[in-house]
Amino acid sequence: MSTTYNFCAGPAMLPQAVMKKAQSELLDWNGLGTSVMEISHRSKEFIALTDKAETDLRELMSIPENYHVLFMHGGGRGQFSAVVNNFLGENGKALYLVSGSWSKSAVDEARKLTSDAQIDTLDLVVNDNGIGAVSIPELTGEAADYRYLHYCPNETVDGIEIFEDINSPWPIVADMSSNIMSREIDVSKFGLIYAGAQKNIGPSGLSIVIVRDDMLELPSLPQSSIMDYRLAVKHGSMYNTPPTFAWYLAAEVFKWLKSSGGVATMAEVNAKKAQLLYDFIDGSNFYNNTVSAQNRSLMNVIFYLANEDNNADFLAEASRAGLVALKGHRSVGGMRASIYNAMPIEGVEKLVEFMKGFAEKNNG
C-alpha cells in the first residue's frame, strides 16, 4: 500500500508508530482485556498512564517545578475564554499582541467576556510590498497595568511564526497550539502556555495547560468548573471525566518524541523540512510565499500558484499522488503544507518532487 502524507493543519497526522501501537492494543490495553477507552479514569492503571504522561512532558520541555501541568477539555478556543475568566477578574486589563488569525480570534473571545476597556491590542504585522513581517516594539510599563500579555507564536492560517523572545514586564500567556515541542523554549519565561492537542500532541478534544504557581493567585471570574485552572490543579485534571483516549494517545506521542531524540532533535528535523520546501518555493517562478524569511513558520508553509486557475488541478493531482489536505485556509486562499513533528522528511521531499513536476507541466 502506498503511503499517504497528510498535510492537514489540524487535526493533523499522528506518528505512524503511535497509530500502529494504538491499533494493536485497541481491544486489549495493558493486558486488561479491555480498551483504554473503557476503563475508569480513576483506576490505578489509568492514573499510572497520566503520571507517566506528565513526567515525560516535563522532561521533554524542561518544565520547572513551580509550574503545574494540566490536561483539559477542548482546544485553543476553549482556552481563549479560560485565560480571561481565570486571570482578569472584574477590573483587570490584558494586552493582546495580534500577528494573525488566531491571535485575532483570541481578542474577539476576550472582548465577549469583558468590557472593551479591559482588552488592549497591539498589531505586530507590517506589510512591505506584499511581504508580511513581524515587528515587536519595546514593551514598557508598570507591571500592574496588565494582568498578562497574550500572544500566539505560530499563526497556522497566515504561515507566520515569531521566533524571538517577547520581553514583557507582564506575565506572558502563549497559545502554542501549533508549535509546542517543535523547537526548544524556556518555559520559565511564561506565566502560562496552552496548546490544543490536535497538531503536535494528539487527537482533538484535549488541551495542555502549563501554568506557573503565582498566576493562580490572580483574581478570577465565575466560570465553568471544567475550565477552572485552580480546580484542575486541585483535582489532578480529573474534576470531571477527562478525554481518556486523547490523553492516552498524547502519552504515546510523548514516548515517541523521547525515543526520537527529544525536542532538540525534532527542532533540527523541522528546520530541515521547512528549509527544503521554502528553498524550492523561492527558486520557482510558479510558486510564491508572502511571509518575510525571518517570520516564516516552520510548521505551516503557505504558498500560492502563479495562476489561481491551476489550484483545483493542483489539489486533485496532489491527492492522487498521496499528498492530501494542501488547500489553504478559506480566509487567505492558496495552499498550505502543515509539517508538524509527525510529518517525516520523506513527505516533504515527495511534496517538493510533485510541485516541481506540476510546475514543469503547467508553467507557460
Curated annotation (Swiss-Prot):
Catalytic activity, as annotated: O-phospho-L-serine + 2-oxoglutarate = 3-phosphooxypyruvate + L-glutamate; 4-(phosphooxy)-L-threonine + 2-oxoglutarate = (R)-3-hydroxy-2-oxo-4-phosphooxybutanoate + L-glutamate
GO cellular component terms, semicolon-separated: cytoplasm
Pfam family, any one: Aminotran_5
GO process terms (BP): L-serine biosynthetic process; pyridoxine biosynthetic process
GO molecular function: O-phospho-L-serine:2-oxoglutarate aminotransferase activity; pyridoxal phosphate binding
Recorded metabolic or biological pathway in which this protein acts: Amino-acid biosynthesis; L-serine biosynthesis; L-serine from 3-phospho-D-glycerate: step 2/3; Cofactor biosynthesis; pyridoxine 5'-phosphate biosynthesis; pyridoxine 5'-phosphate from D-erythrose 4-phosphate: step 3/5
Cellular compartments annotated: Cytoplasm
Residues reported to bind pyridoxal 5'-phosphate: 76-77, 102, 156, 175, 198, 240-241
Modified residues annotated as N6-(pyridoxal phosphate)lysine in this record: 199
The keyword Disulfide bond is assigned to this record: no
InterPro entries membership: Aminotrans_V_dom, Aminotrans_V_PyrdxlP_BS, Pser_aminoTfrase, PyrdxlP-dep_Trfase, PyrdxlP-dep_Trfase_major, PyrdxlP-dep_Trfase_small
Assembly information from the UniProt record: Homodimer.
Protein function: Catalyzes the reversible conversion of 3-phosphohydroxypyruvate to phosphoserine and of 3-hydroxy-2-oxo-4-phosphonooxybutanoate to phosphohydroxythreonine.
Protein name per Swiss-Prot or TrEMBL: Phosphoserine aminotransferase
Organism from which the protein derives: Shewanella sediminis (strain HAW-EB3)
Gene: serC
